[in-house]
Amino acid sequence: MELEKQIQEVYMSKKSINAYLYSKDDPTLSKDHPKRIFMDRDNGYLNSDVFPKNSEMKFLYEQDELLNFISSCLGVSPIYRWADPLACHAYNVMKPDGVLPWHFDSCEFTLSFMIQKPEKGGIFEYCPDIREPGNENLKEVKKVLDGDRKKVREL
């Protein structure tokens, strides 16, 4: 597998983050605000800029057919590739007992591929339409962060 050839270049880290991927607390917000609820993150990344030119992931990412397929499935057009040269098609790596907690990605949507089946865990959870432009829906986000599973779906 491509990643195994570069495993020594994976940057591993542990942090406490909120659902918005921030690691710093904002004491100007109320104590029960979702941005003040922190969870442990223990994972690593192989950034896109270190991939070889013949990378399988890079090849897949650059295919117009994949972009058109996603656009057709979602009914969204146009869809643009992320221009960030470090993160546009990075590998997210977890060791046993690693975790990437429930969070919002920094893009309107993200396409994730599970490259290797985990021995345990690895369940992808999401909450469809929990927020929308102009409405962060903080009350519902807080419920999910507090353990309410009514809106949570699994893949």
PLM feature segments, named:
Residues M1-E2, N137:
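General structural signal for secondary-structure boundaries
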Residues L67-L155:
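Catalytic core of non-heme Fe(II) oxygenases with the double-stranded beta-helix
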Residues E2-F69:
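Non-heme Fe(II)-dependent double-stranded beta-helix
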